[in-house]
């Protein structure tokens, strides 16, 4: 579809722009419409911006022929009388205009450009209406920058043409001046008088063209200045985004687009600088009084140089902030003696063909004058050279991939240390880069700085160091403020909340929802706190112990973050972990669901722990909430949480195991939620010689060990109980092994004993209370907690056939006095002694319980 035809279909606001355009133009709109196809088929850009006037003259005569031809056609149709009149009128008017061919070419070229701009605006507005979500906030500004660059290029081409015409005009003047000067005629000679008159007219025309070129140069410089004022804020927006991206925020800015714009701006400025040099040379050849070009060129050149310096200094940036390879999710934290990477970039992609550019790195060029501020040296090479070949193919990028820091020794001996008012993790350091840039005779020393980094000496400091990086980049308005932690500001919750969510979205792929953020807010400020005006101090963020676990808030949250990343990432991303929910909210949610509904939440009393809570409705309408002892990473390294949930067993009164976890909150069947995580690939080539085994978690109901302080009363219809858990492996359950202490101690059972691993900790039902009073007599629990014990009580000693005769009627009543004063491990440090009938064979060291025996498949006889 022709451009004019598309313009006729626009909405009224854009039609008004089109009418306004042609109301200010010499070309009538009916002439544009009648000759639309012919006009759009011609190369008006070459005719208007080219150095050869013959192309403009040729198009001019073709245009007149086309008008004359169409006037003849219209004369045959009486209904086209008005159109015929307008065509003839424009035919006469255009021939009367001075420099008609050039004026016509420039006019139509500019009209076509404006038409295209209106058409693009209309198309963009239509897309915004159809897909408003796809429109970026800065989309309009981006299109404005693109259109301005196109306009500036057109102005530059026009200025080049004007300067070329000025050269021709000056050559004509010089030639005529030499002819006049060499002529030896009388002053009253009419021919001499005519020569002087022509020479004066030539000088007047030269002066006119000089003024036009000077005005065009000023206009171009003004437009270039405006473009810089648009580009620099876009670069600052990118830097702010980069600073927030370092602490987990999403990064939207495209650096390649900025590089394209900055390079285009620099090319235009360097080109204008070269043109001004040419104009300076022209003005020095022909000098006369009141010549504005001679003085004006120097002023314009100084302004162009100032703009170039400003652009180049701002265009030298740190593209990738310092980061150690082992902690890519936590940049700006460096460890002494460990390698780190950093990348710098010059967004003005212009380099001399034979000039290599060398960047040099340093640290703390202007350190703060504070006592105890540590000083560091860069051990590896602090220089990086960029060859023209690499610069042309990859851009002006300096990659420092193997930098290492070492602390300077204080006092000439011994290891340096920090004795200042700030701790190591609050001390901020800045790495700087310098490059000597040369292009087209302009030499500049460019400098850029990284964001402040924290330098640690031990990886144990990583968590608190990251808290410092988070706090600084969230709140600091000055990215070079190394004394920020001398008086750190408070963090408003409306900034801190999203930043905490970024930690999860960037590290584990899913941020925090409003409910989870609400729980964290209540944990920090209390449940009755208003959402407006809440702010948290730096000390409270990293040091204040928050109930109920009395753990510092950041330490507690960071341990959870590590736990999710290492063991629970898929569950977290799929939304199966509610995570941040208080115990009171947990009770409120589960109370309204059916029995067997469970949820997963993070422990508030244990670092990096996750627990499972479920609800059971009793026959007497009482509601019980059970919670498993929290699982830590030590347990989850051996047994994934998905398998724990799918294979968990709770022993009933009859010692029958059953899985009470049936529905993930609100009502998702357990196997539907977790089945996809437990699919194991079968090895068909493996000979089935052994009975398969698996680890499971087992809990017992032992109400006789339940203790509840009498002064702490639970809700009348809701009891909350906490279960200690044990890990029970198949193929044969046996004596109890406490798995977590074994894992913490690093016990290696070996492949021979792995099938026999069993942990049947006698779990205890405990009320979920913040404090447990010691030495309180056992209360009357009431009918709602009178669960049947596992074993029937006995009133008389009953002979046990499996004991030796001398131990069957042993009186244990008198031994009760030793119950709280002796420890069995002090008496028998090597474990239970073997009885006479027992064997020392390892394979027979465990006596298994049949009720805990589980297997995955049929029993297949062994060949051995």
From Swiss-Prot:
Pfam families (alphabetical): SH2 (PF00017), STAT2_C (PF12188), STAT_alpha (PF01017), STAT_bind (PF02864), STAT_int (PF02865), STAT_linker (PF21354)
Key word Transcription present: yes
Record key words, sorted: Activator, Cytoplasm, DNA-binding, Host-virus interaction, Nucleus, Phosphoprotein, SH2 domain, Transcription, Transcription regulation
Example GO biological process: positive regulation of transcription by RNA polymerase II
Limits of the SH2 domain: 572-667
Phosphotyrosine PTM sites in chain numbering: 690
Subcellular localization, as worded in the UniProt entry: Cytoplasm; Nucleus
Main location: cytoplasm
Function summary: Signal transducer and activator of transcription that mediates signaling by type I IFNs (IFN-alpha and IFN-beta). Following type I IFN binding to cell surface receptors, Jak kinases (TYK2 and JAK1) are activated, leading to tyrosine phosphorylation of STAT1 and STAT2. The phosphorylated STATs dimerize, associate with IRF9/ISGF3G to form a complex termed ISGF3 transcription factor, that enters the nucleus. ISGF3 binds to the IFN stimulated response element (ISRE) to activate the transcription of interferon stimulated genes, which drive the cell in an antiviral state.
Protein family (similarity comment): Belongs to the transcription factor STAT family.
Subunit structure as annotated in this protein's UniProt entry: Heterodimer with STAT1 upon IFN-alpha/beta induced phosphorylation. The heterodimer STAT1:STAT2 forms the interferon-stimulated gene factor 3 complex (ISGF3) with IRF9; interacts with IRF9 in the cytoplasm. Interacts with CRSP2 and CRSP6. Can form a homodimer upon IFN-alpha induced phosphorylation. Interacts with IFNAR1; the interaction requires the phosphorylation of IFNAR1 at 'Tyr-467'. Interacts with IFNAR2. Interacts with ARL2BP.
Name assigned to this protein: Signal transducer and activator of transcription 2
């Amino acid at each position: 579809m022709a451009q004019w035809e598309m313009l006729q279909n626009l909405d009224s606001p854009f039609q008004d722009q089109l009418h306004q355009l042609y109301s200010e133009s010499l070309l009538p709109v009916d002439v544009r419409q009648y000759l639309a196809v012919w006009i759009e088929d011609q190369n008006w850009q070459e005719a208007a911006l080219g150095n050869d006037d013959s192309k403009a003259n040729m198009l001019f005569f073709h245009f007149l022929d086309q008008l004359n031809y169409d006037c003849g056609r219209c004369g045959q149709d009486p209904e086209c009388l008005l159109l015929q009149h307008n065509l003839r009128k424009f035919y006469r008017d255009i021939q009367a205009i001075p420099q008609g061919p050039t004026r016509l070419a420039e006019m139509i070229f500019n009209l076509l450009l404006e038409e295209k701009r209106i058409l693009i605006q209309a198309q963009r507005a239509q897309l915004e209406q159809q897909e408003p979500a796809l429109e970026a906030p800065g989309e309009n500004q981006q299109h404005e920058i693109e259109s301005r660059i196109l306009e500036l290029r057109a102005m530059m081409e026009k200025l080049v043409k004007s300067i070329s015409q000025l050269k021709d005009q000056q050559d004509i003047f010089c030639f005529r001046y030499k002819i006049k000067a060499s002529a030896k005629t009388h002053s009253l000679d009419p021919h001499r008088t005519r020569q002087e008159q022509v020479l004066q007219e030539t000088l007047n025309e030269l002066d006119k063209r000089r003024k036009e070129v000077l005005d065009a140069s000023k206009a171009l410089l003004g437009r270039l200045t405006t473009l810089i004022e648009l580009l620099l804020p876009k670069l600052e927006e990118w830097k702010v985004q980069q600073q927030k991206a370092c602490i987990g925020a999403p990064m939207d800015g495209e650096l390649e687009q900025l590089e394209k714009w900055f390079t285009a701006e620099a090319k235009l400025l360097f080109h204008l600088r070269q043109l001004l040099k040419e104009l300076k040379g022209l003005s020095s050849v022909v000098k006369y009084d009141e010549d504005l070009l001679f003085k004006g060129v120097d002023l314009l050149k100084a302004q162009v140089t100032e703009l170039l310096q400003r652009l180049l200094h701002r265009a030298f940036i740190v593209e990738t902030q310092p980061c150690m390879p082992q902690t890519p999710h936590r940049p700006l934290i460096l460890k002494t003696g460990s390698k780190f990477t950093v990348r710098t970039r010059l967004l003005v992609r212009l380099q001399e063909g034979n000039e290599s550019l060398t960047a040099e790195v340093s640290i703390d060029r202007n350190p703060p004058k504070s006592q105890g501020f540590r000083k560091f040296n860069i051990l590896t090479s602090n220089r990086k050279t960029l060859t023209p070949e690499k610069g042309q193919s990859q851009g002006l990028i300096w990659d420092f991939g193997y930098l290492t820091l070492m602390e300077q020794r204080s006092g000439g001996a011994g290891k340096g240390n920090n004795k200042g008012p700030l701790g190591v993790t609050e001390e901020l350091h800045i790495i700087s880069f310098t490059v000597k840039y040369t292009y087209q005779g302009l030499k500049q020393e460019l400098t850029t700085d990284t964001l402040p980094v924290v330098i640690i000496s031990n990886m144990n400091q990583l968590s608190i160091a990251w808290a410092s990086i988070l706090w600084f980049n969230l709140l600091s308005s000055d990215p070079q403020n190394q004394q920020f932690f001398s008086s750190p500001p408070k963090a408003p919750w409306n900034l801190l909340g999203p930043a905490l969510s970024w930690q999860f979205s960037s590290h584990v792929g899913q941020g925090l929802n409003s409910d989870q953020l609400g729980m964290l807010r209540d944990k920090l400020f209390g449940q009755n706190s208003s959402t407006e005006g809440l702010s948290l101090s730096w000390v409270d963020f990293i040091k204040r112990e928050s109930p109920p676990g009395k753990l510092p808030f950041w330490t507690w949250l960071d341990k959870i973050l590590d736990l999710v990343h290492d063991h629970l990432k898929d569950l977290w991303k799929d939304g199966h972990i509610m995570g941040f929910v208080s115990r009171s909210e947990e009770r409120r949610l589960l109370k309204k669901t059916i029995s067997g509904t469970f949820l997963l939440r993070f422990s508030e009393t244990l670092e990096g722990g996750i627990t499972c809570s479920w609800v059971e409705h009793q026959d007497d309408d009482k509601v019980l909430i059970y919670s498993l002892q929290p699982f830590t990473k030590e347990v989850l390294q051996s047994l994934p949480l998905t398998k724990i949930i799918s294979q968990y067993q709770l022993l009933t009164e009859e010692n029958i195991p059953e899985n009470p976890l049936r529905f993930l909150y609100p009502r998702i069947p357990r196997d539907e939620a977790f089945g996809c995580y437990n699919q194991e690939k079968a090895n068909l080539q493996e000979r089935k010689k052994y009975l398969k085994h698996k680890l499971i978690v087992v809990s017992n109901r032992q109400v006789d060990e339940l203790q509840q302080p009498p002064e702490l009363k639970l809700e009348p219809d809701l009891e909350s109980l906490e279960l200690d858990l044990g890990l029970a492996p198949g193929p044969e359950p046996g004596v109890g092994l406490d798995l977590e202490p074994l894992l913490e101690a690093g016990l290696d059972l070996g492949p021979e004993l792995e099938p026999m691993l069993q942990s049947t900790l006698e779990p205890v039902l405990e009320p979920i209370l913040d404090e447990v009073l010691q030495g309180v007599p056992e209360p009357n629990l009431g009918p709602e907690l009178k669960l049947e014990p596992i074993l029937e009580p006995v009133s008389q000693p009953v002979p046990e056939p499996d004991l030796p005769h001398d131990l069957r009627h042993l009186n244990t009543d008198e031994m009760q006095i030793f119950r709280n004063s002796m420890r069995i491990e002090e008496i028998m440090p090597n474990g239970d002694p073997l009885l006479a009938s027992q064997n020392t064979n390892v394979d027979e060291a465990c006596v298994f319980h049949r009720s805990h025996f589980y297997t995955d498949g049929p029993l297949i006889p062994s060949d051995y």
